[in-house]
Swiss-Prot record:
Chaperone keyword on record: yes
Keywords: ATP-binding, Chaperone, Cytoplasm, Nucleotide-binding, Stress response
Location relative to the cell: Cytoplasm
Gene: htpG
Protein name as annotated: Chaperone protein HtpG
Keyword Cytoplasm applies: yes
Length: 639
């Protein structure tokens, strides 16, 4: 097949134009990272070649000595990063460089704030390494040829970063990619061998491929360093995770994280372990400092790279960690898996099951250590972790039955114990503060913290000084449905079933409720008749001390909050009729006993108020307003 010698003038995708502007403005203060990003891309290209060559050795084209070469030209004012990895075809260049063809693009741009520091972090997360070249260059030339294609299928891509680029077919004898940066004015300090070497050692020492430069020697005659023809390897060129832990510095761990996670910030915490036994594997797993912008997209990229005997196999190895730990980044290197392992094999592999269980154990252990830390640093780290990843950790209660108790101990909530709005109360904290005779862990669910705090269902609990956990994250309904108890204590919604305080409720209160139920039997039946199909029942309650009424559901029925959540997500839900509970001591209820003319209006308002108080929406707001107006007028006319 002959290559068509064409030269095209093309425009960047709109998002790429936006990204190029962001790059220059948000990342200039950390401009050195351009070299890290280009080297990282070159390393990935070599990994992909190794993997494809497992089934097609001809891709090496008699050149299996993979390396990355960095060079510079003072006169031309250029820096070049070249690799002999997999390379790209013409279409791949268009797909990978002219466009951003990935999910989450819209979410990424929506998340941008205009704050340089925050935007720099987001840009890093998005994985836009190649474009970082434009931080220091006003023109970038890329030449490439994909392994397996003949020499006349080379491609040259060139752009000034203004919104367009040229693309032409060229003859390229060697496979791989070469990126040449034509530096902007004022960036000449980068045209220095010592400077480039220091950047490579700082950011890319962990890269497993040799990163080579031409050796430089001092010339007495020229009174400067001169470049020789001898190659010199700048980095250690060994798998960082395979080194003994005591030989790896904190800075090296951090830089390796930035490489695998495409992040610009150091990680929050990490665990590095070698497992020996039936399965032998090494894991280096990181918890990021901030949540990615697509964290709540359960189909988003997972962060674990799989290696087999230090040979890269795949990115995004979802089988290695459960979905609720999708924020974890890092690598797992197996000694036992076959080199030709596929995603299909991973789904059925017993070795993978064992590695997954071991990795979950390590991550949860790391989080346990942070949660139990007595140091200010440890406490601050766990606080940050929960703020960033707490909601997805709650998913684990339903997803990971084997570790449910362990995950439950990591959960943090707001409660009525204090006025704090931070989720810093653990279930163990709650159990430790339970009153003598208290047998249940009480909670209320709502669509916001404000709604939870003002829920009428809390009134009797506040009166008796019984702590209630306030749940307002969307995932919380799913959480409590899958966590029936903790340390032998049943979790009980304060808005479900009849009020049951167990030993905390004295006999006098029980008798009083029975008495009131008898006295108000006629009233509750009359209200129920008026409300008809809107309610399942109407009954007297002692759970209210200030409000006239509230809505509850039967113990095993869907809560009103969950019903609203599912409907808002577009799911078809069978409506659960609530039970209207009324406070016999409230003036509004007492008035109803003697009301005749406007009994139906007062009954409907009682129900509508209770619905609004729990965050519900009125089916007929106009009728509600009309009734309120009529009652205002009737009350005024009596005076």
């Amino acid at each position: 097949m002959e290559a068509t010698a064409t030269k095209e003038h093309l425009n960047f995708q709109t998002e790429v134009k936006q990204l190029l502007k962001l790059m220059i403005h948000s990342l200039y203060s950390n401009k050195e990272i351009f070299l890290r990003e280009l080297i990282s891309n070159a390393s990935d290209a070599a990994d992909k070649l190794r993997f494809e060559a497992l089934t097609d050795g001809a891709l090496y084209e008699s050149d299996s000595d993979l390396k990355i070469r960095v060079s510079y030209d003072k006169e031309a004012r250029t820096i070049t990063v070249a690799d002999n990895g997999i390379g790209m075809s013409r279409q791949e260049v268009i797909d990978h460089i002219g466009t951003i063809a990935k999910s989450g693009t819209r979410e990424f741009f929506d998340a941008l704030t205009g704050d340089q520091a925050k935007d720099a972090h987001l840009i890093g997360q998005f994985g836009v390494g190649f474009y970082s070249a434009f931080i220091v260059a006003d023109k970038v030339t890329l030449t490439t040829r994909r392994a397996g294609l003949t020499h006349e299928h080379g491609v040259r891509w060139e752009s000034g970063g203004e919104g367009d680029y040229t693309l032409e077919t060229i003859d390229k004898p060697g496979r791989g990619t070469e990126v040449t940066l034509h530096l902007r004015e004022g960036e000449d300090e980068l045209l220095n061998g010592w400077r480039l070497r220091s950047i490579i050692r700082k950011y890319s020492d962990h890269i497993t491929l040799p990163i080579v430069m031409k050796k430089e020697e001092w010339s007495q005659e020229k009174n400067e360093n001169t470049v020789t023809e001898e190659d010199e390897t700048i980095n250690q060129a060994s798998a960082l995770w395979a080194r003994p832990k005591n030989e790896i510095s904190e800075e090296q761990y951090n830089e390796f994280y930035k490489h695998v996670a495409h992040d610009f910030e150091p990680p929050l915490a990490y665990v590095h372990a070698r497992v020996e036994g039936k399965q032998e594997y090494t894991q280096l797993l990181y918890v990021p400092s901030r949540a990615p912008f697509d964290l709540y997209d359960r189909e988003s990229r997972h962060g674990i790279k799989l290696y087999v005997r230090r040979v890269f196999i795949m990115d995004d190895a979802k089988q290695l960690l459960p979905n609720y730990l999708r924020f974890v980044r890092g690598i797992i290197d197996s000694n036992d898996l076959p080199l030709n392992v596929s995603r299909e094999i991973l789904q059925e592999s017993k070795d993978i099951e064992a590695m997954r269980a071991g990795s979950v154990k390590k991550v949860l252990g790391l989080l346990d250590d942070l949660a139990q830390s007595e140091t200010d640093e440890g406490k601050a780290k766990f606080k940050t972790f929960w703020k960033e990843f707490g909601q997805v950790m709650k998913e684990g209660v339903a997803e990971d039955y084997a570790n449910r108790e362990r995950i439950a101990k990591l959960l943090r909530f707001v409660s009525t114990h204090s006025d704090s709005e931070e989720q810093d109360v653990s279930l163990s904290d709650y159990v430790g503060r339970m009153k003598d005779g208290q047998e249940k862990i009480y909670y209320v669910t709502a669509d916001s913290l404000t709604a939870a705090k003002s829920s009428p269902h809390l009134e009797i609990f506040r009166k008796k000084d019984i702590e209630v956990i306030l749940l307002f994250d969307r995932v919380d309904e799913w959480l409590v449905a899958n966590l029936p108890e903790f340390e032998g204590k049943h979790l009980q919604s304060v808005a479900k079933g009849s009020l049951d305080l167990g030993k905390l409720e004295d006999e006098a209160e029980k008798k009083e409720q029975e008495k009131e139920a008898g006295e108000y039997k006629e009233l509750t039946e009359k209200i129920k008749e008026v409300l008809g199909e809107q309610v399942k029942d109407v009954r007297i309650t002692l759970r209210l001390t200030e409000s006239p009424a509230c809505l509850v559901t039967e113990t095993h029925d869907m809560s009103g909050n969950l019903e609203r959540l599912l409907k808002s997500a577009g799911q078809k839900v069978t409506h659960t009729k609530p039970i209207l509970e009324i406070n016999p001591y409230h003036p509004m209820v007492e008035r109803l006993k003697s009301e005749e003319t406007h009994f139906a209006d007062w009954s409907h308002i009682l129900f509508d108020q209770a619905l609004l108080a729990e965050g519900g929406q009125l089916e007929d707001p106009a009728s509600f307003v009309k009734r309120i107006n009529q009652l205002f007028l009737s009350t005024g006319s009596k005076e």
